[in-house]
């Protein structure tokens, strides 16, 4: 369920699940830098530095992210 918060001008705005998870889990700044890079370049391949910063931050707080091969193997079993 999305939460509602007030914007600086006093309007109500719904927060989505992803934003709430990032705030609770940390790494908001790293995620914003990654998003900014993508919107500036429209190419994830040009954002490897920002992606690595986000990955390191997330893994420091939550442990390793599953790899694509982990997901494929899990789906096969």
UniProtKB/Swiss-Prot annotation:
It is found in: Cytoplasm; Nucleus. Keywords: Cytoplasm, Disulfide bond, Nucleus. GO terms for cellular component: mitochondrial intermembrane space; nucleus. GO terms for biological process: mitochondrial cytochrome c oxidase assembly. InterPro entries: CHCH (IPR010625), Coa4-like (IPR039870). It holds the Pfam family CHCH. Disulfide bonds join 27-57, 37-47. A motif (Cx9C motif 1) lies at residues 27-37. Residues 24-65 form the CHCH domain. A motif (Cx9C motif 2) lies at residues 47-57. This is Coiled-coil-helix-coiled-coil-helix domain-containing protein C550.01c. The lineage of its organism: Eukaryota, Fungi, Dikarya, Ascomycota, Taphrinomycotina.
């Amino acid at each position: 369920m999305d939460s509602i918060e007030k914007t600086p001008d006093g309007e109500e705005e719904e927060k989505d699940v992803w934003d709430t998870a990032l705030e609770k889990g940390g790494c908001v700044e790293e995620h914003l830098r990654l998003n900014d890079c993508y919107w500036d370049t429209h190419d994830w391949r040009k954002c490897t530095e920002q992606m690595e910063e986000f990955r390191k931050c997330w893994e420091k707080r939550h442990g390793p992210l599953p790899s694509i091969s982990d997901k494929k193997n899990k789906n096969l079993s």
